[in-house]
Curated annotation (Swiss-Prot):
<dbReference type="InterPro" id="IPR030963">
    <property type="entry name" value="DHQ_synth_fam"/>
</dbReference>
<dbReference type="InterPro" id="IPR016037">
    <property type="entry name" value="DHQ_synth_AroB"/>
</dbReference>
<keyword id="KW-0547">Nucleotide-binding</keyword>
<feature type="binding site">
    <location>
        <position position="194"/>
    </location>
    <ligand>
        <name>Zn(2+)</name>
    </ligand>
</feature>
<comment type="function">
    <text>Catalyzes the conversion of 3-deoxy-D-arabino-heptulosonate 7-phosphate (DAHP) to dehydroquinate (DHQ).</text>
</comment>
<feature type="binding site">
    <location>
        <position position="274"/>
    </location>
    <ligand>
        <name>Zn(2+)</name>
    </ligand>
</feature>
<keyword id="KW-0963">Cytoplasm</keyword>
<dbReference type="Pfam" id="PF24621">
    <property type="entry name" value="DHQS_C"/>
</dbReference>
<dbReference type="GO" id="GO:0008652">
    <property type="term" value="P:amino acid biosynthetic process"/>
</dbReference>
<keyword id="KW-0456">Lyase</keyword>
<feature type="binding site">
    <location>
        <position position="152"/>
    </location>
    <ligand>
        <name>NAD(+)</name>
    </ligand>
</feature>
<dbReference type="Pfam" id="PF01761">
    <property type="entry name" value="DHQ_synthase"/>
</dbReference>
<feature type="binding site">
    <location>
        <begin position="115"/>
        <end position="119"/>
    </location>
    <ligand>
        <name>NAD(+)</name>
    </ligand>
</feature>
<dbReference type="GO" id="GO:0000166">
    <property type="term" value="F:nucleotide binding"/>
</dbReference>
<dbReference type="GO" id="GO:0046872">
    <property type="term" value="F:metal ion binding"/>
</dbReference>
<dbReference type="GO" id="GO:0009423">
    <property type="term" value="P:chorismate biosynthetic process"/>
</dbReference>
<dbReference type="InterPro" id="IPR030960">
    <property type="entry name" value="DHQS/DOIS_N"/>
</dbReference>
Length: 383
């Protein structure tokens, strides 16, 4: 399938990290400019493009043409699609292929794909030869608005999501909104959960705009570019203030403590996409916030109503086979949440809501309260 690309004027968002600052270039039709942008940053570099089998069929040839057209030498590394590649075996494969391709420290890795490819390729770049620069070319909505920005890279452990990794900032992000036309409706919806997250954590006006325009984002063009750019600006500002997640950056994990546990409980097998887990997790976080007297019940209903209107799952029972594999066991979910990256001295850290657009970090929620909360949610779910 060939997607026609009608170029729009690109939007540039700066991630301000001093000497390690970089641009996020957003727009419909910006992919063909990738080669000249990279050549300006690293003239003469050899470039290894890491992608997955699905993305390769749509965008690898065009990406390589842009790179070679700018005088760059390329090689390709193609991995299997999905979370199965975000593993010890997956990163070993990519590292060995980079070494075989003789990628040196002054060369580049290009991550062409969604969140899995970006995390995997970025982590491999971080550790091969003790660090090779890389460029993110995100091809999913989730990657364009979240995982490609901020330098978090890594893989999953059998014990949990994203437990092995490194902070390794890209030197450039090129987000062509036209490539999102090749996503399945389910993949696009999963990415939309991360867009809604930005409204929930700090921008009620953006959330209200999304309630009106979420269908226009699916259609594309100006609404889609606005949503991606607004999300990237929000994340870039937080990353600039708290690169290593010592404080404010934790707000970006709204819904992720619950969501990552749900993903782990399904075995990262594709029954629950990351964004779908985040959607359910954000509703659970809002409901827990209401139980703690922090947010009005009307706001919780508004959040769930919007996510459901966008076609996202919002309840545990929305997960296929949710009564299997620990999904219907509050104690099993608590065990998985105990492996969350935000755990400090054995205590869970939750991102909770005081209102739509007002998120807070909380480390003083009693585990027994969370366990009872989950048990009630499971008991209320139909068999």
């Amino acid at each position: 399938m060939t997607i026609p690309i009608k170029e729009s004027d690109p939007i540039t968002v700066d991630v301000a990290l001093g000497e390690r600052s970089y641009d996020i270039v957003i727009g419909r039709g910006v992919l063909p400019s990738l080669g000249e942008r990279i050549a300006a940053l690293r003239p003469g570099a050899r470039v290894a493009v890491v992608t997955d089998a699905r993305v390769a069929t749509h965008w690898l040839q065009r990406t390589e043409a842009s790179l070679t057209g700018a005088g760059l030498t390329t090689s390709r590394i193609v991995v299997d699609e999905g979370e199965v590649s975000k593993s010890y075996a997956g990163v070993e494969f990519v590292c060995e292929e980079l070494i075989k391709a003789r990628i040196e420290r002054n060369d580049l890795v290009v991550a062409l794909g969604g969140g899995v490819v970006g995390d995997l390729a970025g982590f491999a770049a971080a550790i091969v030869r003790r660090g090779v620069d890389f460029v993110q070319v995100p091809t999913s909505l989730l990657a364009q608005v979240d995982s490609s920005v901020g330098g978090k890279t890594g893989i999953n452990s059998p014990q949990g999501k994203n437990l092995v990794g490194a902070f390794h900032q890209p030197i450039l992000v090129v987000a062509d909104t036209a490539v999102l036309d090749t996503l399945s409706p389910r993949q696009f919806r999963a990415g939309y959960a991360e867009v809604a997250k930005y409204g929930l954590i700090g921008d009620e006006a953006f959330f209200a705009w999304l309630e009106v325009h979420h269908a226009d984002i699916v259609k594309g063009d100006a609404a889609r570019e606005h949503a991606v750019a607004t999300s990237c600006r929000a994340k870039a500002a937080i990353v600039a203030r708290d690169e290593r997640e010592s404080g404010e950056r934790a707000l970006l994990n709204l819904g992720h403590t619950f969501g990552h546990a749900l993903e782990a409980a399904t075995g990262f097998c594709g029954r629950l996409y990351h964004g779908e887990g985040v959607s359910i997790g954000m509703v659970l976080a809002a409901e827990l916030s209401a139980q703690l007297g922090m947010i009005a019940a009307a706001d919780v209903s508004r959040i769930e109503r919007h996510l459901a209107a966008a076609g996202l799952p919002t309840r545990l029972q929305d997960i296929a086979g949710f009564r299997q594999e620990g999904l219907a066991d509050a104690d099993a979910l608590m065990t998985l949440m105990a492996q969350d990256k935000k755990v400090r001295r054995g205590r869970l850290t939750f991102i909770l809501l005081k209102a739509i657009g007002q998120a807070v970090v909380s480390s003083d929620v009693e585990p027994s309260m969370v366990r009872d909360f989950l048990a009630r949610k499971l008991a209320d779910a139909p068999a």
